[in-house]
Amino acid sequence: IMTIRIGINPLTWTNDDLPSLGASTPLSQCLSEGKLAGYAGFELGNKFPRESDQLNQVLAEHELALISGWYSGKLLEHSVEDEIKAIEDHLQLLKQCGSTVMVYCEVTGCIHGEQNTPLSKRPTIAADAWQDYGNRLSKVANYCLSQGVQLAYHHHMGTIVETSEEIDLLMENTSESLGLLLDTGHLTYAGGDPIATFKKYQNRIVH
C-alpha cells in the first residue's frame, strides 16, 4: 500500500518571488496554521533557518516534516561538476533534515521574477540541444540519488520548461533518476492538460 503525505509550500503565507507579500507573517504562524490545517510537512521558504539543527528544532516544535526545498539550477551555464558543487550545501541540508526530494528548476535566463517582462521573452533550448542538457541533468540527478535525495524537476512559467511539449522533451532526454514535480497550476497556465501529463508520466512523478 502506498503512503502519500500531503505537504504545503509556505508561499500560501509568504512569497519568495514577491517578499512584500506576507512580509509581516512570522514563520511560527505559517507552521502552526499549516499543522492545524492537517498538513504533514512544509517545503522550505525564505523565513526558514538554513542550519539543520535549528531547522529540525523549529519543525519538531510543530510536529512537521521537511518535505523538500527549491533549488535554482544553473546547469545551462555550469559544468556537471560545478553544478554538483553548487548544489552540495542544499543537498546536505535536505539530507540532515530527513527530506528525500529536492525541487529543481533551471533558472538560467529565467524571467518569472520580472513582472514587467512578457512570457514571450522567456529562455528556450534549441531542439538539438535537449539531448546534451538531458544527459548532463541526469548526471546531476544520479549524484543526488546516490546521496539519498531525488531531484524533482519543477516545470515553471518563465523558464526553459514551461509547456507540455517541453515537459515531453525533458522526460524523453533524461534518465529515470530525474523525477517530475507536476505543478497543475503552472501547466494549466501554460495551456497544458495536467491530467494527460499525469497519465503519461505517473511513474516519474515524485512530488
Features from the language model and the residues they span:
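A short, acidic/glycine-rich surface segment
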Residues: 16-19, 111, 189-192
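Active-site acidic/histidine proton-transfer and metal-coordination neighborhood
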Residues: 80-182, 189
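Short beta->alpha connector loops
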Residues: 45-50, 158-159, 185-188, 192-193
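Generic recognition of short, well-ordered alpha-helical segments
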Residues: 53-54, 162-166, 192-196
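Short, surface-exposed basic-aromatic patches at helix termini and helix-loop junctions that form
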Residues: 56-63, 168-174, 198-202
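N-terminal pre-domain/capping segments
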Residues: 1-100, 145, 179
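A general structural signal for well-ordered secondary-structure junctions
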Residues: 65, 177, 204-207
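Aromatic-lined glycan-binding groove of carbohydrate-active enzymes
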Residues: 193-207
